[in-house]
C-alpha cells in the first residue's frame, strides 16, 4: 500500500500553533489524523520563510516533518503554472502587468505536483483554492488533492470523530 504524503502551507501552521484561532481545532485534528495514519508530513522552505515573518522556526513541529527545499524543477513548474493562471485571468478580463511574479502558494503547488510522493496539499487559505482550480481546469488534473482545513478532517477523510 502506498504511503500518503501531505505538504502543509504557512496558513495551516498559523492555525495549528495559535490556540485562539477559529481553525485551531481543525488544524489540530488534521495534524493528529496525519500522524495517526502514518502520513509523511512535509513543509516547504517557502512556508518556513513565510512563518518566520511573525514567528520563530523553533515553534514549528519540525521533528514530525520533512523539509522540502524549493529547487530548479519546482521553479520551472511554478512558472508554467502561473502562466496558466495569468492566461485564465486575462480571458476573464483582468489586466496583467508585463512583469510576472510567482506567488508563494503557486510555488508550493509546484512542489506538491513535482514531488512524486506528495498526494495532498493542506491549507487554511481558501483564496488559493481558486488558483488551484484554475490550474487544474487548464491542465485537466494535478498529481495532488487540495485539502481545505475549514472543512474538518473527518468530513474530508470520511471517518467518525469519537471524543476521547
Regions found by a protein language model. Give the residues of each.
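Short, well-structured N-terminal submotif of metal-dependent ribonuclease cores
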Residues: 1-42, 52-65, 150, 154-164
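Acidic, PIN/NYN-like endoribonuclease modules and their adjacent C-terminal/linker elements
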Residues: 1-3, 115-164
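Conserved glycosyltransferase catalytic-site signature
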Residues: 10, 45, 101-109, 125
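A generic structural signal for short hydrophobic patches within well-formed alpha-helices
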Residues: 13, 48, 75, 128-129
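Acidic catalytic patch
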Residues: 46, 66-99
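Active-site regions of enzymes building and remodeling cell-envelope glycoconjugates
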Residues: 60-69, 137-141
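Acidic, metal-associated active-site segment
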Residues: 98-120
Amino acid at each position: 500500500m502506498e504511503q500518503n504524503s501531505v505538504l502543509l502551507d504557512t496558513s495551516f501552521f498559523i492555525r495549528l500553533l495559535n490556540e485562539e484561532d477559529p481553525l485551531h481545532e481543525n488544524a489540530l485534528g488534521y495534524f493528529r489524523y496525519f500522524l495517526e495514519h502514518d502520513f509523511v508530513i512535509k513543509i516547504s522552505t517557502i512556508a518556513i520563510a513565510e512563518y518566520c515573518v511573525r514567528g520563530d522556526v523553533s515553534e514549528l513541529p519540525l521533528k514530525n516533518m520533512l523539509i522540502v527545499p524549493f529547487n530548479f524543477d519546482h521553479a520551472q513548474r511554478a512558472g508554467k503554472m502561473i502562466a496558466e493562471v495569468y492566461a485564465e485571468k486575462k480571458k476573464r478580463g483582468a489586466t496583467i502587468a508585463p512583469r510576472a511574479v510567482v506567488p508563494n502558494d503557486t510555488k508550493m503547488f509546484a512542489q506538491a505536483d513535482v514531488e512524486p510522493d506528495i498526494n495532498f496539499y493542506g491549507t487554511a487559505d481558501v483564496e488559493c483554492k481558486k488558483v488551484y482550480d484554475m490550474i487544474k481546469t487548464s491542465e485537466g488534473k494535478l498529481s495532488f488533492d487540495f485539502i481545505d482545513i475549514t472543512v474538518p478532517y473527518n468530513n474530508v477523510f470520511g471517518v467518525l470523530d469519537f471524543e476521547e
